[in-house]
Amino acid sequence: DVSRPRFEYNDIRYRNTSKLGALFNWSFMKGGNKYEFRNFFSQRGVSALTQREGTNYYSDKDIRKWESLYTGRTTYSGQLSGTHTLRENIDKVDWTAGYAFASYREPDRKIVNSILDENKTEQPNYYVSDPMRYYQDLKDHSASLAANYEHKFAVSDMFAPVFNGGIYGEYKDRTFDARRFGYNLLGTGYDRYADWDYTGIFSDDNISADRIWMREVPKNNDSYTS
């Protein structure tokens, strides 16, 4: 038997990445008290364009796929803490309050599939099929608070037991929103054939009852809060 691939594609990818990071920490000491404030921030953005061309042997069709998107990631983490020594190292209290935020965004992902029209000889001869736009926004918030207490019992030089106690609390919240829209190319008055330039397909001028119908394609997991 001779194995045959299911598909054979060649991809051309253009990618641009920008990053921004910041770190800010400080501490303050006075007497038996020490305070610390720690901060971390990161921002990452990626713009990408993919052009795929090849053959799908399942359908025995030559296809093209075009995808344009931007993704953004934001991360912040901050902590404020304190340590307090009381009564000549007999009692000690420390506490920490923290907050963290993370988000992921895809403000406008565009996807276009094209199929070769074997009966059309002039260029362009790929006709657009199933364009789609996708939006998503994910946000995570978390806050925490911890406190510890330590007491040393001065019984003798050979025996000095220590009592420790503490509390910890945490709160987390997540929201996710996503929307996807499909384009029904049922009307006329626009060019369905394109050669890697799909700006006309997504143009607002082409969205009408007699040209391109824009419909939302919902899913059960598109939006949730936890």
Q: Where are each of the predicted segments found?
A:
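Solvent-exposed loop segments that connect transmembrane elements
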Residues: 2-10, 49-66, 111-131
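Short intrinsically disordered, low-complexity coil segments enriched in acidic
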Residues: 1-14, 64, 192-195, 224-226
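Transmembrane beta-barrel wall of Gram-negative outer-membrane proteins
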Residues: 1-49, 76-78
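Face-selective signature of the C-terminal outer-membrane beta-barrel domain
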Residues: 29, 33-44, 71-226
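Hydrophobic alpha-helical scaffolding
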Residues: 13, 65-71, 136
